[in-house]
C-alpha cells in the first residue's frame, strides 16, 4: 500500500511539473501574451462614462469632473431645476471653490442593503485580539446574518469573499462590534473589543432609524442590567438605585449545552427584555493544510468552523424577562420548532408600544417562513406573516420587510403569486390589506420608503415591454397599489442615484452593446431634465475591441426566452470557423450574464485566442418568475444546461462561424461543479471543461447554500447532483483546479472527485494551486492554465497534455 501511495504522489508531482512547463514555456510574445495585451491596449479608451455628482448645499445644483480624452477632462456645473449645463476647464472658471465645500451625494447615506454578488474576488482577514471568542457573520442581501464561525481569542481567520460583501463581527454574547464592507483590495479587521466606526447604513431596512449608543446589557432608563453567570441570566440593579448592586437570579437551569446568553434586547420602557436560551451542538471543523507557509518551512494545519448539509444545528428560543416580576419565561417553540440557524441567534424587534416583540422563523428546509409576535404580558405567540412553498422560500433575497410603526402596518415581499412582489399587512392582525405591486415582472430591490406620502421606490425587472427581463428600472407605487409609475426609459440596465433632498435622480443606463448614458431626471414623474453624458468609446473600438452581441432564443420548453451574449475576437473573420467556449455560473442565487456596459476583459482576452465566448442564464437561476427559478429545486445537476445548449444551437443556426463540433466550458465554484457536469451529462456537446474550486458534491459544501436548493433532510437529490457519484460517466478533456487554502468550498470536494475519477480509470488533468484560496483560476497562474488548456484542446485538438491516469 505504501508503494502505491508513493507511485500516485510521484505521478501527481510529475504531472504538475509537466503542465507548468507547457503553460509557461512560450515566447514572451506568444498567443497568450498577445491575448492578454488586449487589457493594456483597451485601457483608458472610454470617456464621458463616469459621473460622480457633488451636490451644492442647497441641493438644486451640482458639479462633476469627467474625462473627455486621454489625459484630458472638464468640469461641469448643472442647474438641476432648469437643466442648464456649463462646462469649463476648472472649478474656478465655474465660479466654484477649488476645495469641495459641498455635501456628498445622498447615495452614500442610502447605501444598498444587499451585498453585491458581482464584485471581484478578494480576501477578508479577521484577527481577534480580545480575551474571548468573536463571531463572524456575512450580512446577506436582505440584511440577515449568516454565521461564518467563531474566531477564538488570539486566532486569525482568513477567507475568500467578494468586493461589496458586508460582514458583521460580534462578541461572544452577540453584541455587534462592527459592520464592514469589503473593498476590492481586501479587508483586514482587528477585533479589539471596541465598537467600530462602521457605516450605519449597512444594515437591514427595518433598522434604518438611528439610536443612541447604549451600554450592552443595560436598560434604557439605566436602572437595570442583565448579566450571565455560569450559563444563567441575572437581573442586576444599577448604580444610583435604592438596591444598588443587588443581583437576582432569573434562571437556574442553564448548562454548557443549554446556556442562557445574549444579545439582550430591551424594550424602550425598560419593563421587559429578551435574552436567548440556546441549544449548543458540536461544531464541524474543516481542516486544511498550508503546505508551503510563508513564515516557516514545515506545513501548517488550519481549522475552521464549517457546517455542512445535514449537520445538527444549534437552536435558540427567546426568553422574556419581566423586571417587575424578576422572572424569565422561555417562549414556547410550538410555532418555531425547527429553525434554520448556524449560531442559535434570533433577531428581536420590540414594537414602539413595548407591548410585543417580533422575530423571524425560517424552518429548516426553507419551505415555511414566519414572522412571529410575542405578547409581553402573557408570552403568547401569534403569526404575523406566514409564507409556505412546496419547493423553497428564498430567504436570503426575498424576505424584505419594512415596519410602518406609526400605522402598525408592514410592507412585505413575497413570491406567493409566482413573482416577487410587495404586499401590505395589518401588523396587529396579521391580515393582508392589499397587494402593492403586481404583474408578470419582479421587484428586484426596494430603494426607499416614504411613510408620509405612503409610497415606495424600487428597482424592477421585466417591467418594460420588450426589454431584457433582467434590466433594472426605477419604479414608484403607493402603498395601496395605486399610482404605479416607471420612472426610467432607456432600453438598458439602470443604476440610480438620488439627490440629497430626493427630488432628482441620476440615471446611468447601458447595455453590453450600448455604452453608458447618464441622465438627470425628476423624482416626481421621471421626466428628463437633461442628458449629462453619453460615453465615448470611439478609441476603444479603434483598438479592435468588439461590442458583445446580445441574442435571445427559446429554452427547453420552446416558449421561454433565454437571454445571453456572444463575444468575438478582435481579429474575427466571418469566413472562418471558431470553437465556442461557454463561461458558466448557474448558481440559483442570482443571474450572471453581464447586462451593463463593460470591457469584460476576462471574456474578451479569452476570445482573443480564437474563441467565441458565450454566456446565458438558463432556467433555475434567479431574477425571473418563481416557475423559472424552481427548476433548480433538488436538481442542481440540471444547471440550466438544456436551455443554454438550445440557446447555443439556435445562435449557431444564423452564425455559420460558430463551430459546434468544438465546444468548451469553464467556471468556478458552483460554475466549477457545472463545468465538470457538462462532461458527465452532456459530453456529446461539450468536449473540454476547466472546473475551478467546484462544489463537486453538495454534501461537502456549506450548509446554507446547499440546503436552500436541495432541501433537508438530505435525500437522493444530493446524490444526483454529485459529480463524485457520477465521475465514471465523465468523457472529454477535463482540467480540475483548486486552491489548497479554499475556505469557501472545502478543497476536499475537489480531492474526492479526483479520487473518484482515478478509481474509474479516467484520464484528466489536475492542478492544485499552493497558498491560494477560492477562485484559484482567477489568479494569473490559474488564468493562464485555463487559457492554455482550452487552446490546446479546441484549437490544437491533436495535442495532448500530460494527464493524471489511474487504473
Task: Place the predicted regions along the sequence by residue.
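Predominantly five- to eight-bladed beta-propeller fold
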Residues: 81-102, 247-265, 275-333, 524-538, ...
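Blade-terminus and WD-like Trp-Asp/Gly-His loop motifs, strongest in beta-propeller folds
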Residues: 54-60, 216-224, 263-272, 347-357, ...
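Short glycine-/Asp-/Thr-/Trp-enriched loop segments that recur within the blades
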Residues: 45-47, 98, 210, 254-261, ...
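Alpha/beta-hydrolase-fold serine-hydrolase catalytic core, especially in secreted/extracellular enzymes
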Residues: 45, 58, 70, 83, ...
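Asparagine-centered strand-capping/turn motif at beta-strand->loop junctions
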Residues: 124-130
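Structured interaction patches on ligand/partner-binding surfaces of diverse proteins
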Residues: 172-197, 289, 296
Amino acid at each position: 500500500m505504501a508503494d502505491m501511495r508513493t507511485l500516485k504522489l510521484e505521478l501527481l508531482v510529475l504531472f504538475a511539473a509537466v503542465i507548468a512547463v507547457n503553460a509557461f514555456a512560450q515566447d514572451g510574445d506568444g498567443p497568450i501574451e498577445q491575448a492578454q495585451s488586449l487589457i493594456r491596449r483597451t485601457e483608458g479608451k472610454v470617456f464621458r462614462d463616469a459621473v460622480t455628482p457633488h451636490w451644492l448645499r442647497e441641493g438644486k445644483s451640482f458639479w462633476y469632473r469627467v474625462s473627455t480624452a486621454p489625459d484630458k477632462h472638464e468640469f461641469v456645473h448643472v442647474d438641476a431645476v432648469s437643466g442648464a449645463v456649463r462646462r469649463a476647464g476648472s472649478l474656478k472658471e465655474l465660479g466654484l471653490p477649488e476645495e469641495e465645500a459641498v455635501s456628498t451625494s445622498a447615495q452614500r447615506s442610502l447605501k444598498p442593503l444587499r451585498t453585491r454578488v458581482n464584485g471581484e474576488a478578494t480576501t477578508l482577514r479577521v484577527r481577534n485580539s480580545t480575551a474571548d471568542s468573536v463571531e463572524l457573520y456575512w450580512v446577506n442581501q436582505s440584511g440577515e446574518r449568516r454565521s461564518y464561525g467563531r474566531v477564538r481569542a488570539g486566532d486569525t481567520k482568513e477567507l475568500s469573499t467578494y468586493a461589496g460583501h458586508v460582514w458583521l463581527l460580534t462578541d461572544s454574547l452577540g453584541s455587534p462590534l462592527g459592520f464592514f464592507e469589503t473593498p476590492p483590495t481586501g479587508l483586514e479587521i482587528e477585533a479589539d473589543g471596541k465598537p467600530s466606526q462602521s457605516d450605519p447604513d449597512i444594515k437591514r431596512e427595518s433598522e434604518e432609524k438611528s439610536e443612541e449608543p447604549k451600554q450592552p446589557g443595560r436598560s434604557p432608563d439605566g436602572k437595570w442590567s442583565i448579566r450571565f453567570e455560569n450559563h444563567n441570566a441575572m437581573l442586576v440593579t444599577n448604580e444610583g438605585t435604592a438596591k444598588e448592586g443587588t443581583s437576582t437570579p432569573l434562571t437556574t437551569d442553564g448548562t454548557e449545552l443549554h446556556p442562557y446568553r445574549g444579545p439582550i434586547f430591551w424594550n424602550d420602557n425598560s419593563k421587559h427584555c429578551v435574552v436567548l436560551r440556546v441549544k449548543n451542538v458540536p461544531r464541524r471543523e474543516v481542516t486544511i493544510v498550508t503546505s508551503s507557509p510563508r513564515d516557516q518551512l514545515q506545513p501548517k494545519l488550519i481549522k475552521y468552523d464549517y457546517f455542512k448539509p445535514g449537520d445538527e444545528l444549534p437552536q435558540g428560543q427567546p426568553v422574556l424577562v419581566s423586571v417587575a416580576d424578576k422572572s424569565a419565561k422561555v417562549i414556547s417553540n410550538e410555532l418555531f420548532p425547527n429553525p434554520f440557524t448556524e449560531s442559535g441567534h434570533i433577531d428581536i424587534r420590540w414594537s414602539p408600544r413595548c407591548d410585543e416583540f417580533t422575530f423571524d422563523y425560517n424552518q429548516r428546509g426553507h419551505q415555511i417562513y414566519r414572522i412571529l409576535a410575542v405578547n409581553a404580558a402573557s408570552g403568547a405567540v401569534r403569526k404575523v406573516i406566514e409564507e409556505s412553498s412546496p419547493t423553497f422560500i428564498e430567504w436570503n433575497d426575498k424576505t424584505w420587510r419594512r415596519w410602518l410603526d406609526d400605522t402598525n402596518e408592514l410592507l412585505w415581499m413575497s413570491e406567493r403569486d409566482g413573482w416577487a412582489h410587495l404586499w401590505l399587512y395589518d401588523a396587529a392582525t396579521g391580515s393582508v390589506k392589499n397587494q402593492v405591486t403586481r404583474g408578470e415582472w419582479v421587484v428586484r430591490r426596494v430603494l426607499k420608503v416614504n411613510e408620509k406620502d405612503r409610497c415606495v421606490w424600487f428597482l424592477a425587472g421585466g417591467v418594460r415591454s420588450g426589454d431584457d427581463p433582467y434590466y433594472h428600472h426605477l419604479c414608484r407605487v403607493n402603498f395601496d397599489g395605486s399610482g404605479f409609475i416607471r420612472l426610467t426609459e432607456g432600453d438598458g440596465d439602470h443604476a440610480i442615484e438620488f439627490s440629497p433632498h430626493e427630488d432628482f435622480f441620476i440615471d446611468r443606463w447601458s447595455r453590453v452593446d450600448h455604452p453608458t448614458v447618464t441622465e438627470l431626471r425628476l423624482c416626481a414623474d421621471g421626466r428628463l431634465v437633461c442628458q449629462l453624458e453619453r460615453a465615448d468609446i470611439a478609441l476603444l473600438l479603434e483598438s479592435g475591441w468588439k461590442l458583445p452581441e446580445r441574442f435571445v432564443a427559446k429554452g427547453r420548453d420552446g416558449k421561454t426566452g433565454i437571454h445571453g451574449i456572444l463575444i468575438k475576437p478582435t481579429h474575427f473573420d466571418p469566413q472562418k470557423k471558431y470553437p465556442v467556449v461557454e463561461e458558466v455560473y448557474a448558481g440559483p442565487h442570482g443571474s450572471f450574464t453581464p447586462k451593463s456596459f463593460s470591457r469584460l476583459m476576462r471574456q474578451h482576452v479569452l476570445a482573443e485566442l480564437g474563441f467565441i465566448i458565450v454566456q446565458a442564464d438558463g432556467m433555475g437561476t434567479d431574477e425571473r418568475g418563481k416557475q423559472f427559478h424552481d427548476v433548480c429545486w433538488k436538481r442542481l445537476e440540471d444547471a440550466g444546461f438544456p436551455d443554454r445548449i438550445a440557446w447555443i444551437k439556435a445562435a449557431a443556426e444564423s452564425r455559420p462561424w460558430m463551430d459546434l463540433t468544438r465546444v468548451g466550458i469553464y467556471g468556478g465554484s458552483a460554475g466549477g461543479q457545472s463545468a465538470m457536469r457538462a462532461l458527465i451529462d452532456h459530453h456529446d456537446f461539450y468536449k473540454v471543461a476547466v472546473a475551478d474550486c467546484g462544489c463537486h458534491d453538495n454534501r461537502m459544501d456549506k450548509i446554507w447554500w446547499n440546503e436552500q436548493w436541495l432541501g433537508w433532510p438530505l435525500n437522493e437529490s444530493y446524490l444526483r447532483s454529485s459529480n463524485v457519484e457520477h465521475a465514471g460517466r465523465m468523457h472529454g478533456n477535463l482540467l480540475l483546479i483548486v486552491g489548497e487554502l479554499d475556505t469557501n468550498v472545502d478543497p476536499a470536494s475537489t480531492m474526492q472527485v479526483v479520487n473518484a475519477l482515478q478509481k474509474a480509470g479516467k484520464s484528466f488533468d489536475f492542478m492544485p494551486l499552493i497558498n491560494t484560496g477560492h477562485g484559484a483560476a482567477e489568479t494569473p497562474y490559474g488564468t493562464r492554465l485555463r487559457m492554455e488548456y482550452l487552446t490546446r484542446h479546441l484549437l490544437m485538438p491533436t495535442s495532448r497534455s500530460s494527464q493524471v491516469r489511474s487504473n
